[in-house]
Amino acid sequence: MFGKQGIRCARKGDERNIKIIVNRVNSERNIKSIGICSPSYPGTFHYQKRYKRGVEFLQNKGFTIVEGNLTGKEGYRGEISGGVQDRAEELNQLIPRVDVIMTSIGGYNSNSVLKYIDYDLFKQKSPIFIGYSDTTALALALYKKTGCITYLSQSVISNFGEFEPFNELNYFYFDFMLQSKCETLMVQIPDVWTDEWINWETYERTKKTNKNEWIIFNKGEFNGTLIGGNIDTIVGIIGTEYMPKITEDTILLLEDVYTDLGRLYRNFTTLALHGIFDKIGGLIISKFETIGENSDVINDIINEFVGHRKIPILLNFDCGHTHPSCLMPIGGKITLSLS
């Protein structure tokens, strides 16, 4: 089923061989307020201590926090934060009130609210939207319907509710992407990363870290528009009016949590059946959380589905469920240069 292809690793200090350059938008924005919504999982109910840590962390950075009206609620059977209209309305109410809208966490059901979002109001007020995991659906839909650049992949609970040092490392990329005055930014390779699962509620020890490396699968350089996010979520909206068009100008970004080979292979097959891999001009694959010793699976799958394409392909990037997570612009213009 799978073949093999040579790969090349790039470590910290090797940025000259791997360049991801982002043409920034929002460079004149003065971010003062962050609104928090829960369009999918009721994480603010289940992870109250971690949510509070995330809110206090952002407040200590000087931001005014505006909580959506589903904050702290159990929702439907503790699995969905509220009725579909309630979840959509929570986001709609935040649109004119804040500079940034950030989701509390991911989940499984953000695609259900897409037809109830006030896209006209969002385009008019144009707050910065930051999604994570399942809320990839909103990040993609808001970009498709309004043309406004959105961002992945950070959330209040998952990223800023972390204990040190990863809350600060995640914030570095928030600040770097949204508050730098530079017009172009080169994304930096984090020194270390982690996907270790330990107690979210009470600090016991610092998470174990791994020395970081990004991996060149195919060399090349391409300037294009970044589209993508959580692959499981993309499969849930592909072919609908909410999925941005994939063209020869697209640099595709994919990430997920690794559960099993069958599910991952199915999702890549779905994208292939839609002709995605035959169109794109570049590909960035982020680290798959909890993949562990199965990391070679990613290399094999990429080789099968995209190995025939002579396009730049980067593996082991940091934008998704692992820490730290770079913040990347959906709809933004970037340059992917691998040599």
Regions found by a protein language model. Give the residues of each.
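ATP/NTP phosphate-donor binding region
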Residues: 18-97
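Short Gly/Thr/Asp-enriched flexible loops that form oxyanion-binding sites at enzyme active sites
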Residues: 106-124, 140-143, 297-298
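ATP/nucleoside-binding phosphotransfer catalytic cores, i.e., glycine-rich phosphate-binding loops
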Residues: 282-339
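Charged helix-capping and loop-helix junction motifs
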Residues: 50-51, 83-86, 266-271, 296-303
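Short, acidic/small-residue loops that bind anionic groups at enzyme active sites
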Residues: 119-145, 149-156, 309-313
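Conserved anion/nucleotide-ligand pocket segment
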Residues: 151-229
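Internal helical hairpin/lid segments
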Residues: 235-293, 297
